[in-house]
């Protein structure tokens, strides 16, 4: 299931692209969250090779131009790799609907997941930033 991680990560990356010396406290104030949440998110973005930082130097910087960072890349960096939709796991096998619901929905849900990922892949951080500035 999607939560707000993708939106928060894009928010963080947009701020960092404007000013690489922006602290996690300033970012947290903009996102309206705790600086610890921001630092965790920044850590995930570093592991995904989207951000970099240097010891002793405040802030972080983008490793690539915003136009070269797809929203899918950001999504995969911060979102657990699970299906977008979940089907309840233990429907009643004696029920005519319960015994077939998972198979009936699998193809549709997988198709929607692919469509979402394709759309995210077609959009960049720069595309979002163009709407911001």
UniProtKB/Swiss-Prot annotation:
* Residues in HTH rrf2-type domain copies: 1-130
Q: Which residues bind DNA?
A: 24-47
GO MF term set: DNA binding; DNA-binding transcription factor activity
| The keyword Transcription belongs to this UniProt entry's keyword annotation | yes
One biological process GO term for this chain?
Answer: regulation of DNA-templated transcription
Q: Does the keyword Ribonucleoprotein apply?
A: no
Name listed for the protein in its UniProt record: Putative HTH-type transcriptional regulator YwnA
- Could you tell me which species this protein originates from? Bacillus subtilis (strain 168)
**Gene name on record?**
ywnA
């Amino acid at each position: 299931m999607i939560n707000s991680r993708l939106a928060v990560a894009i928010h963080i990356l947009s701020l960092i692209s404007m000013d690489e010396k922006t602290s996690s406290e300033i970012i947290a104030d903009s996102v309206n969250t705790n600086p610890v949440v921001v630092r965790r998110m920044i850590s995930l973005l570093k592991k995904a090779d989207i951000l970099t930082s240097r010891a002793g130097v405040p802030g972080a910087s983008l490793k690539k131009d915003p136009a070269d960072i797809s929203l899918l890349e950001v999504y995969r960096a911060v979102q657990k790799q699970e299906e977008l939709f979940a089907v309840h796991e233990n429907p009643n096998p004696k029920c005519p609907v319960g015994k077939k619901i998972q198979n009936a929905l699998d193809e549709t849900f997988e198709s929607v997941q692919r469509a979402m990922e394709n759309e995210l892949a077609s959009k960049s951080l720069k595309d979002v930033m163009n709407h911001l500035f």
